[in-house]
Amino acid sequence: MKHLHRFFSSDASGGIILIIAAVLAMIMANSGATSGWYHDFLETPVQLRVGTLEINKNMLLWINDALMAVFFLLVGLEVKRELMQGSLASLRQAAFPVIAAIGGMIVPALLYLAFNYADPITREGWAIPAATDIAFALGVLALLGSRVPLALKIFLMALAIIDDLGAIIIIALFYTNDLSMASLGVAAVAIAVLAVLNLCGVRRTGVYILVGVVLWTAVLKSGVHATLAGVIVGFFIPLKEKHGRSPAKRLEHVLHPWVAYLILPLFAFANAGVSLQGVTLEGLTSILPLGIIAGLLIGKPLGISLFCWLALRLKLAHLPEGTTYQQIMAVGILCGIGFTMSIFIASLAFGSVDPELINWAKLGILVGSISSAVIGYSWLRVRLRPSV
């Protein structure tokens, strides 16, 4: 029990469990004895009905759309705290992850197009390497434990959130044909209600969560990625302390173990099971997976590092306190973990064209993401000193 308590008390424990869940998913998805059970579990239908409202989704989508909204709620709370009181409190500090995210989307997309521009079909996947899987990136960072400066973790969170928002906008503009304006209208009203609650000083967290459920449902029905609702709710929950209590900090404290030890490992287990059946070296070196690998492994860190360097040289932004440019470069490599967000964009880009292209895209995403995780982790492990 003593060793178990020590493990769960360590900062790296959540990341270790997430990696174990991902490896387990890969093994089960590629084993003849367990692949059927694994896919049956993910395809299990789950129905929610409240009055006339009905949501029918399989287990995989409930995990990705509902449980991950809770994760994004926690991320929103943490980023808000740093924007208001911490390492992103000044305009120049807050601008740094925004500039980094822009570079981290533009350069990978251009690098992908350098490989695929001549092919009008694979060219449609230009946004695949522009995405970052924030959950896996933070999970890998968590493996380094307490040696990671808080400012560096917050920088990665803020960068990945902006990256995700960019990906959501790209999906809405280029890959979605059936946005529901009525649902977007309901979402806008829910956001307005959250703003009024905040301005009126309402401090009951449950009220924000209730409106957040309405917002999540509306965003889900609109065709936009529903996890966005979690970030929005997190930004509106009051942070200011009153009588020594802060609703945002209290909720953050409550959510953290649930997210680290249940939601993220379940997310990893549900999404890491990529089948390697039929994979060949010849296929891996075709323009589609090569463009994705190059975009994630080279384009992401290059774009983030280049735009950060320009921001510092032009004095548009400051480095987060307690971090170095080399650490920022390593975080840029971690942002090459595109994984689930990249797979989602690939399914939108090629789903109606050729399922075989999705398989090759998944292979490129897997190779690029794993390579980025290993290299980014190794670089940070060398650059970060263990805390005493």
From Swiss-Prot:
Gene: nhaA
Organism, as annotated: Escherichia coli O6:K15:H31 (strain 536 / UPEC)
Chief location bin: membrane
Protein name as it appears in the record: Na(+)/H(+) antiporter NhaA
Protein's GO biological process: regulation of pH
Pfam families reported for this sequence: Na_H_antiport_1
Alphabetized UniProt keyword annotations: Antiport, Cell inner membrane, Cell membrane, Ion transport, Membrane, Sodium, Sodium transport, Transmembrane, Transmembrane helix, Transport
Domain of life: Bacteria
Places the protein is found: Cell inner membrane
Family to which this protein belongs: Belongs to the NhaA Na(+)/H(+) (TC 2.A.33) antiporter family.
HAMAP family linked to this entry: NhaA (MF_01844)
An example Gene Ontology CC term for this record: plasma membrane
Bilayer topology: Multi-pass membrane protein
Topological domains, Periplasmic: 32-58, 117-122, 177-180, 223, 273-286, 351-357
GO molecular function: sodium:proton antiporter activity
Alphabetical list of Gene3D superfamilies matching this protein: Na+/H+ antiporter like domain
Upper classification of the organism: Bacteria, Pseudomonadati, Pseudomonadota, Gammaproteobacteria, Enterobacterales
PANTHER family: NA(+)_H(+) ANTIPORTER NHAA, SODIUM ION/PROTON ANTIPORTER NHAA-RELATED
InterPro entries (alphabetical): Na/H_antiporter_dom_sf (IPR023171), NhaA (IPR004670)
Topology feature Cytoplasmic, residues: 1-11, 81-96, 131-154, 201-204, 237-253, 311-339, 381-388
Reactions performed catalytically: Na(+)(in) + 2 H(+)(out) = Na(+)(out) + 2 H(+)(in)
